[in-house]
């Protein structure tokens, strides 16, 4: 299987009906712009759903819908974690995957609260969880290579991960889902995400690396050094976004990237969580720039490089809560705001409907 074996055909959203969509938003019973970011979000959702339905006129009559919102949590282990770059050992990845399956993690609580269906995907943790229902096996290996010593994986593995992710998204699309959100679990994956960020954005490592879920200063110095070694080791091989994933990524980051591309290909809305998920989005946009039209960025995390990545992607996140957990928690918490955008667009009266003089 070659590097180009899996490709995605992603249409840009149509903006030809923007004036009519914006007019519908502006004529609601409120001053123009008074609902702030919810208005720009409604415009984005209307663009995506108008593109999906291939409507050519009357977008003001379109009813926006969020159908079967689904949270996909991708899990994988990282070779670099053996060097102690995180507050927890790699075994915790497996333990947390079990916790997800048993419904006891933060992401389970939030998904139940807001109405997300949750699926957990084993992309390649060190030891698979057996005898527990609710974990989807999409294993690409038993943890990646240690990126400061060797490539994380082969290029062929990236394509295999993309193909698995496409099949996963296709299953949900066929079931009627039109919004997917992505979370992750993988001890050491902030190191991989920071390395990806540095490689793609051409930044110094110190501008990309943070404390993850709470490492001390000594561990942070080790993390910086190892990521710098990784970038130096693979410098000549970093020739494109897929090679960046192969050299520096994680199995869960690969499958998140592929799932974002596949969802956009199917004109589904994609809710991006925190630092790790945004690194996957960064790669996805390099592969297919049109994917950006479909991405909703849930929050700005407490990881110091996240703000830079969001700015690079010209993304304005919906929330800023100081989160640094991952799992898709920020994406889950953003769903009520996304639904609020849909609801005001569909249900608010216009000035003429309400018999109110328009506010200019």
UniProtKB/Swiss-Prot annotation:
Domain of life according to the entry: Bacteria
Pathway terms, separated by semicolons: Nucleoside biosynthesis; alpha-ribazole biosynthesis; alpha-ribazole from 5,6-dimethylbenzimidazole: step 1/2
Similarity section: Belongs to the CobT family.
The UniProt record lists the keyword Transferase: yes
The protein's enzyme class: transferase
Keywords (A to Z) from UniProt: Cobalamin biosynthesis, Glycosyltransferase, Transferase
GO annotation, biological process: cobalamin biosynthetic process
Gene: cobT
Annotated catalytic residues: 327
Native source organism of the sequence: Shewanella baltica (strain OS155 / ATCC BAA-1091)
EC identifiers of the protein: 2.4.2.21
A Gene Ontology molecular function term of the record: nicotinate-nucleotide-dimethylbenzimidazole phosphoribosyltransferase activity
Name of the protein in question: Nicotinate-nucleotide--dimethylbenzimidazole phosphoribosyltransferase
Function of the molecule: Catalyzes the synthesis of alpha-ribazole-5'-phosphate from nicotinate mononucleotide (NAMN) and 5,6-dimethylbenzimidazole (DMB).
